[in-house]
């Protein structure tokens, strides 16, 4: 990540640092010598080791709390990864996290005394929906063909509307919104990836939709790239190519279970209760119509994908086979606040060669 426009080192705030994406983005920034400060904010303990990130656990994302953090740390860039894109993680929290949380963050970023000059927001292709009237590939200027029907889609659309209003009201802040395709990765768990890793995967009778993916590592790289280039606007992020669900299932070694297309949610209840697969309401239209996004705008900023959609699928399938052969890797990391404080600030902790000395 290059320094700021005036040559100063970057100071960054990562929201959702306790989540899968926030933790990995914070780790990536920690390794960048041009980043002076990384602040992580989350409601729960981090799930990955953070060596240089100053993590603050907040029980709420109220304006007063976020405002105090932004002013006290003097951050110039915010990476908002805390937006929920999976309703199975808690549908009752969607509005509070996606809408109210985003509103409070934007209010703090635009308040008097704020030093924020750049904002990167992680969003989702869910904002486009999936219908029979969709174009082959959505561009960023297109809108969805029908109103949002699921709570998660409505919350994402509301959050993006708030971000657009903020960008108009704060022209001195560079605002970038990244809409990601469905993500596949060895470490990531989503309704679709869980289904593909199980013996049975739901489908809709008579439909074989084309799917576009993005590999988990490319997601982190895209967010870092967006911070580095500081280009305003909305960008679709999805790997090149699309492939039919039947091919995806064959690569992953799962058997498709066709459900009636007009009562899929009802007929899936016995399967979901048994844990055979997940079928949240936002996944049903995707299994019928698929979704494609035109990613030319983001590629023109200089971003290169390491995986195509097909390559991401094969890499995910290899991870599934490895997991079935050797089991899940042991989760060794557990955040301990007192230990983290000691390791960062105690005089008795030696500084390793090549590391900056701690200010005492």
Where are these regions (language model features)?
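N-terminal Rossmann NAD(P)H-binding glycine-rich loop of SDR-like oxidoreductase domains
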Residues: 7-32
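NAD(P)H-binding glycine-rich loop region in Rossmannoid oxidoreductase-like domains
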Residues: 58-100, 130
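Short alpha-helix in the Rossmann-fold core of NAD(P)-dependent oxidoreductases
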Residues: 95-102, 106, 120-123, 155-156, ...
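Conserved Rossmann-fold NAD(P)-dependent oxidoreductase catalytic core, especially the SDR/UDP-sugar
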Residues: 104-151
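Active-site Tyr-X1-5-Lys
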Residues: 148-176
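NAD(P)-dependent short-chain dehydrogenase/reductase
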Residues: 166-216
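Mid/C-terminal beta-alpha module of Rossmann-like enzyme folds, strongest
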Residues: 220-281, 295, 308, 315-317, ...
């Amino acid at each position: 990540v290059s320094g700021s426009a005036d040559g100063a080192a970057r100071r960054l705030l990562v929201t959702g640092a306790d989540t899968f994406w926030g933790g990995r983005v914070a780790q990536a920034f920690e390794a960048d010598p041009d980043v002076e400060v990384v602040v992580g904010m989350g409601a729960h303990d981090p799930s990955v080791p953070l060596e240089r990130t100053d993590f603050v656990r907040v029980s709420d994302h109220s304006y007063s709390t976020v405002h105090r953090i932004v002013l006290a740390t003097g951050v110039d860039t915010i990476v908002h990864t805390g937006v929920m894109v999976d309703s199975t993680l808690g549908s009752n929290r969607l509005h509070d996290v996606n809408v109210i949380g985003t509103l409070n963050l934007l209010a703090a970023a635009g308040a008097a005394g704020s030093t924020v000059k750049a904002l990167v927001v992680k969003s989702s292709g869910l904002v486009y929906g999936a219908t029979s009237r969709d174009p082959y590939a959505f561009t960023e200027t297109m809108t969805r063909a029908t109103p949002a029907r699921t709570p998660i889609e409505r919350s994402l659309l509301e959050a993006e509307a708030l971000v657009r209003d903020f960008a108009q009201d704060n022209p001195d802040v560079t605002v970038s919104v990244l809409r990601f395709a469905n993500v596949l990765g060895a470490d990531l768990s989503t309704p679709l990836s869980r289904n593909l890793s199980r013996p049975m995967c739901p489908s809709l009778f008579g439909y074989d939709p084309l799917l576009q993916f993005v590999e988990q590592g490319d997601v982190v790289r895209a967010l870092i790239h967006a911070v580095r280039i500081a280009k305003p606007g909305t960008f679709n992020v999805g790997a090149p190519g699309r492939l039919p669900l039947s091919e995806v299932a064959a690569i992953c070694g799962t058997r498709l279970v066709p459900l009636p297309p007009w009562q899929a949610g009802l007929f899936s209840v016995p399967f979901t209760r048994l844990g055979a697969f997940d079928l949240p309401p936002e996944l049903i239209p995707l299994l019928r119509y698929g979704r494609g996004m035109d990613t030319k705008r983001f590629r023109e900023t200089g971003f290169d994908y390491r995986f195509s959609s097909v390559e991401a699928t094969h890499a995910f399938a290899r991870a599934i086979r490895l997991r079935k052969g050797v089991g899940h890797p042991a989760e060794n990391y557990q955040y301990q606040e007192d230990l983290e404080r000691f390791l960062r600030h105690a005089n008795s902790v030696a500084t390793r060669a090549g590391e900056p000395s701690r200010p005492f």
